[in-house]
């Protein structure tokens, strides 16, 4: 069941990839993918290339995939282990969602952080109180870690 669904999503992704994103299996393992997300142009992550690891559970799509950043990123909703605080990867997951929608949600999280549900409270605090310092720090991390 899971592998059929994952194959279908892979075909759909290859046919109609979400903008600024790509994803596919690592080697022969259909349950482990790597995705690439380009930093959204209107964000401090612009120009960066962010690698994201996706692990599908055996009961996918009834359980959400485990998605984490491999590239270091300065963001209130993404911690130093690469964990992402995103409702659709937790309690708001639905079998109707796809990896394509997950990647788009992560892109929009890069553009519009959610400082009211932070994974890294000190970055959220800076985002709320000193936006320009947040943006310059995020930009310098992007240059340091996400640009080849």
From Swiss-Prot:
Residues 1-147 form the UBC core domain. The active site is at 85 (glycyl thioester intermediate). Its EC number is 2.3.2.23. Induction: Up-regulated by syringolin, a cell death-inducing chemical. InterPro entries: UBQ-conjugat_E2_core, UBQ-conjugating_AS, UBQ-conjugating_enzyme/RWD. Pathway: Protein modification; protein ubiquitination. GO terms for biological process: protein ubiquitination; ubiquitin-dependent protein catabolic process. SUPFAM superfamilies: UBC-like. CDD domains: UBCc_UBE2D. Keywords: ATP-binding, Nucleotide-binding, Transferase, Ubl conjugation pathway. GO terms for molecular function: ATP binding; ubiquitin conjugating enzyme activity; ubiquitin-protein transferase activity. Pfam families: UQ_con. Ubiquitously expressed. Mainly in petals. It catalyses: S-ubiquitinyl-[E1 ubiquitin-activating enzyme]-L-cysteine + [E2 ubiquitin-conjugating enzyme]-L-cysteine = [E1 ubiquitin-activating enzyme]-L-cysteine + S-ubiquitinyl-[E2 ubiquitin-conjugating enzyme]-L-cysteine. Interacts with the E3 ubiquitin-protein ligases MBR1 and MBR2. Accepts the ubiquitin from the E1 complex and catalyzes its covalent attachment to other proteins. Mediates the selective degradation of short-lived and abnormal proteins. Belongs to the ubiquitin-conjugating enzyme family. This is Ubiquitin-conjugating enzyme E2 11. It comes from Arabidopsis thaliana. The lineage of its organism: Eukaryota, Viridiplantae, Streptophyta, Embryophyta, Tracheophyta.
